């Protein structure tokens, strides 16, 4: 973790900064909840659920909207040059009608440890960390009424659809 954190910090520039570094390690309660939920919802063993989690270590880069695609490409190239492997990319910044818009990547360190690296615009990060987070937390509670859950999902989509789409965002892919 210290090597990856240090390397990612070295890639920062004006307009491309790491955000929320204090939250890079998934909390113990959050991890336990995810293992329980995944083992139940995906009908897998607790061990299989634990082995499938790759965001115990997670980072977030905030990139300027206008230069998002170029900065993503620069950071990716620097990571790959240093021996990191891009495993997968989920780009919902190019989508509408979704509850969350961002770019979530899974990278593997040179020694084989997988971690998550999210990329956001200033607007998508602010939305994710504030209003969307509150709505998401309520929506995922088992006791949330289905009608209320549907209202929450509609509101998250409405908010996410209001975000600006970075130019050339379709170039952000594996």
Model regions and ranges:
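Long beta-strand-rich cores associated with HINT superfamily self-processing modules
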Residues: 43-174
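Intrinsically disordered, low-complexity polar/charged tails and linkers
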Residues: 1-42
């Amino acid at each position: 973790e210290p090597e990856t954190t240090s390397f990612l910090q070295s890639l920062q520039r004006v307009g491309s900064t790491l955000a929320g570094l204090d939250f890079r390690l998934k909390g113990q309660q959050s991890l336990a909840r995810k293992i329980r939920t995944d083992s139940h919802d995906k009908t897998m063993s607790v061990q299989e659920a634990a082995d499938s989690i790759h965001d115990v270590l997670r980072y977030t880069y905030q990139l300027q909207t206008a230069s998002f695609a170029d900065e993503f490409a620069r950071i990716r190239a620097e990571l790959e040059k240093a021996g990191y492997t891009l495993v997968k990319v989920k780009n919902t910044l190019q989508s509408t009608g979704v509850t969350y818009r961002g770019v979530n990547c899974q990278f593997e360190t040179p020694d084989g440890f997988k971690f998550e690296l999210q990329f956001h615009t200033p607007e998508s990060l602010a939305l994710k960390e504030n209003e969307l987070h509150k709505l998401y937390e309520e929506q995922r509670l088992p006791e949330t009424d289905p009608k209320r859950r549907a209202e929450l999902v509609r509101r998250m989509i409405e908010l996410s659809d209001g975000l600006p789409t970075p130019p050339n965002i379709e170039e952000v892919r594996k």
